[in-house]
Amino acid sequence: TGTGYKTMTNVEFFIDNDNKIYSFKVTGHVDFALDGDDALCAAISTLVSHTIGQVHEFTDDPCENIVDEDIPMVVFKLTGDEISDLSYIFMESLASSVDDLAMMHPDYIKVSYTES
């Protein structure tokens, strides 16, 4: 990008008392390559969009989704009292994939888990 510094994407997963992921927050931009050619950013965006789409398409679980393109930030939260196992599987799948990307590119992607 020619800025002389590296930015990072931060992905924070929120875990409930049953040790299940019920929410995530993605902030920042990877800047792994020039705009329009950033495979890491595209990978994270695709994984996040796919996860949200799966919950909407394959479950009736209530959820909240906040997108702020100026920050940039995406927050997604399963909000119901009774969440389906399928939604939790989708969230775990996202976490596994993002963890893999972060292990391969630790200078560009940071993953954290918060119990709440």
What are these regions (language model features)?
Residues 4-39, 46-116:
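N-terminal intrinsically disordered, cationic/polar leader segments
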